[in-house]
Amino acid sequence: MTTTPETQKTAVAHGNYVRGSASKVRRVLDQIRGRSYRDALIMLEFMPYRSTDPITKVLRSAVANAEHNLGMDPSTLVISSAWANSGPVMKRYRPRAQGRAFSIKKQTCHISISVESAPTQTNAEVQN
């Protein structure tokens, strides 16, 4: 008889068209990936980057989805995956001397964060 492993529930939240470049957002996401929800919130609160505000908003939304839709406990949640893809670029022009114009690219990105409950250890695993 084969037993199937318990299916892992995952909650996902997306933040689309967030102002800021994807590379700067990825720099923050790389540091919180794999951490617990509480640890990630503390880290995001004290990081000196502008992209932490929209990331915190998406993280709180993912946890709210897990709590409301799947009935998971927020204290056991871990960030299973977090990624940022580049979005559309808004092009603006800056007037310069002698009738020239320099282009300015205002980057946007799409942030996605998924959370799942951390695996709990049974008594047999703890004793070994």
UniProtKB/Swiss-Prot annotation:
Q: Which family, according to the similarity comment?
A: Belongs to the universal ribosomal protein uL22 family.
Question: What is a single cellular component term in the Gene Ontology annotation?
Answer: cytosolic large ribosomal subunit
> What's one Pfam family the UniProt record gives for this protein?
Ribosomal_L22
Extract the GO molecular function terms from the UniProt entry.
rRNA binding; structural constituent of ribosome
Residues folding into a coiled coil are none
Q: How does it assemble?
A: Part of the 50S ribosomal subunit.
Q: What does this protein do?
A: This protein binds specifically to 23S rRNA; its binding is stimulated by other ribosomal proteins, e.g. L4, L17, and L20. It is important during the early stages of 50S assembly. It makes multiple contacts with different domains of the 23S rRNA in the assembled 50S subunit and ribosome. The globular domain of the protein is located near the polypeptide exit tunnel on the outside of the subunit, while an extended beta-hairpin is found that lines the wall of the exit tunnel in the center of the 70S ribosome.
The alphabetized list of GO BP terms reads: translation
Name the UniProt record assigns to this protein: Large ribosomal subunit protein uL22
List the CDD domains. Answer: Ribosomal_L22
Supply the InterPro entries for this chain. Ribosomal_uL22 (IPR001063), Ribosomal_uL22_bac/chlpt-type (IPR005727), Ribosomal_uL22_bac/org-type (IPR047867), Ribosomal_uL22_CS (IPR018260), Ribosomal_uL22_sf (IPR036394)
Keywords in alphabetical order: Ribonucleoprotein, Ribosomal protein, RNA-binding, rRNA-binding
